[in-house]
Curated annotation (Swiss-Prot):
Listed cofactors: Ca(2+); Mg(2+)
EC number: 3.1.21.-
Keywords, in A-Z order: ADP-ribosylation, Apoptosis, Calcium, Disulfide bond, Endonuclease, Hydrolase, Nuclease, Nucleus, Secreted, Signal
Record gene name: Dnase1l3
Any one biological process term the GO annotation gives: DNA catabolic process
Leader sequence segment: 1-25
CDD domains recorded: DNase1 (cd10282)
Segments for region (Not required for free DNA-nuclease activity but required for activity towards liposome-coated DNA): 289-310
Subunit record text: Monomer.
Official protein name in the record: Deoxyribonuclease gamma
PANTHER family: DEOXYRIBONUCLEASE (PTHR11371), DEOXYRIBONUCLEASE GAMMA (PTHR11371:SF32)
Lineage, uppermost ranks: Eukaryota, Metazoa, Chordata, Craniata, Vertebrata
Organism whose genome encodes this protein: Rattus norvegicus
Tissue: Detected at high levels in spleen, lymph nodes, thymus and liver. Observed also in kidney and testis, but not in brain or heart.
Record field: pH dependence: Optimum pH is 7.2. Active from pH 6.0 to 9.0.
Motif (Nuclear localization signal): 301-307
Length: 310
């Protein structure tokens, strides 16, 4: 009996499975929304784009929130959930206002409640002997549960560095990892944010002093060759995503990590894009527990090269 007549059906089935795989995956994003305060809140065009970007993601880290009145996230919840007749609703968890002086920022995580929930959270205390107060804005560490993904839970450590101290701050994330492991029985880690990890802020010779890079157990999804900046005049991989933990590394959807160029996607001029931010979001996907559970195409710690893109 010939198998040829069945080949169109098999091809269609494979395409369906691939589409289902993508639909069931969990998209995680990180976005520095430059100076996200009252003035940007009143820019309706910029806000429309920001909401579109958030809606692409199942969980998104927002940085550089400058909101002394705590209005930004409630406003976003209204835009995301207020007129929605769908069953999908967003929730959020936000840090306190962080910074050494009068200049303060907040980290916020927005997430789809049906897919993700918060298990625990804490603000990292930057008090190690000999290097007290390394972070300009201490990581707001959140442990998430995601019951429908292959990795059922993961810790996200966000970071927005000061450019001049990027090398030291990125290196210090290794100490944050150790601190979280002491507190929680967590195995899956995501470090992400605006690390300012490119161009003159982190020159090539500095990487040897960053434990997050020299330790091969930390897997970098956004490589040094990427450009996460909006301006055409710059090309720097400031924004990064780094994983730790075999389970979560193996759960990454192949070729899902990268930079989301919202300027191109939404056909904006450079000026219009800069009204939104001077950074592009970075992202990746985690496989669903129901999709390709036996796949051997996931990212491998052994095969992953430092600084390479998945």
């Amino acid at each position: 009996m010939s198998l040829y007549p069945a080949s169109p059906y098999l091809a269609s089935l494979l395409l369906f499975i691939l589409a289902l795989h993508g639909a069931l995956s969990l998209r995680l994003c990180s976005f520095n929304v430059r100076s996200f305060g009252e003035s940007k809140k009143e820019n309706h065009n910029a806000m429309d784009i920001i909401v579109k970007i958030i809606k692409r993601c199942d969980l998104i880290l927002l940085m550089e929130i400058k909101d002394s009145n705590n209005n930004i996230c409630p406003m976003l919840m209204e835009k995301l959930n207020g007129n929605s007749r769908r069953s999908t609703t967003y929730n959020y968890v936000i840090s306190s206002r962080l910074g050494r002086n009068t200049y303060k920022e907040q980290y916020a995580f927005l997430y789809k409640e049906k897919l993700v929930s918060v298990k625990a959270k804490y603000l990292y205390h930057d008090y190690q002997d000999g290097d007290t107060d390394v972070f300009s804005r201490e990581p707001f560490v959140v442990w998430f549960q995601a019951p429908f993904t292959a990795a059922k839970d993961f810790v996200i450590v966000p970071l927005h560095t000061t450019p001049e101290t990027s090398v030291k701050e990125i290196d210090e994330l290794a100490d944050v990892y150790t601190d979280v492991r002491r507190r929680w029985k967590a195995e899956n880690f995501i470090f992400m944010g605006d690390f300012n990890a490119g161009c003159s802020y982190v020159p090539k010779k500095a990487w040897k002093n960053i434990r997050l890079r020299t330790d091969p157990n930390f897997v970098w999804l956004i490589g040094d060759q990427e450009d996460t900046t909006v301006k055409k005049s710059t090309s720097c991989a400031y924004d990064r995503i780094v994983l730790r933990g075999q389970e979560i590394v193996n759960s990454v959807v192949p070729r899902s990590s990268g930079v989301f160029d919202f300027q191109k996607a939404y056909e904006l001029s450079e000026e219009e894009a800069l009204d939104v931010s001077d950074h592009f979001p970075v992202e990746f996907k985690l496989q669903s527990s129901r999709a390709f559970t036996n796949s051997r195409k996931s990212v491998s710690l052994k095969k992953k090269k430092k600084g390479s893109r998945s």
